[in-house]
Swiss-Prot record:
Gene Ontology BP term (one): translation
This protein's UniProt keywords: Ribonucleoprotein, Ribosomal protein
PANTHER family listed in its UniProt record: RIBOSOMAL PROTEIN S9 (PTHR21569), SMALL RIBOSOMAL SUBUNIT PROTEIN US9M (PTHR21569:SF1)
Protein name: Small ribosomal subunit protein uS9
One protein family per Pfam: Ribosomal_S9
Gene Ontology annotations for the cellular component aspect, listed alphabetically: cytosolic small ribosomal subunit
Amino acid sequence: MSATQNYGTGRRKTATARVFLRPGTGNISINNRTLDNFFGRETARMVVRQPLELTETVEKFDIYVTVIGGGVSGQAGAIRHGITRALMQYDETLRGALRKAGFVTRDAREVERKKVGLRKARKRPQYSKR
């Protein structure tokens, strides 16, 4: 690995993203596809760009991402987390601003398992008094 590249692993729900930051012009490539091609939803694209816009490094890096697992929002969150970690590896002084925005903390919420005798994780069958 070259010294000019920074790496960050991001996770959200069941998605895992490996993010590589390299000096460049602002291209974001996810699983060898462009950001606009990979995410149909504008909100997902916005989530991915948030740490870059906050730190004003949008045009400074080319970002290469491989992401597996999860759905659209989980993958977007995982990429955001990975970009945040890679930015902190690049410049530790960015940590304060990223922490304040809430990008550093891994969102620990996971899907609750379905229990036996229940319809979903917490939804119970209808109760009949008589």
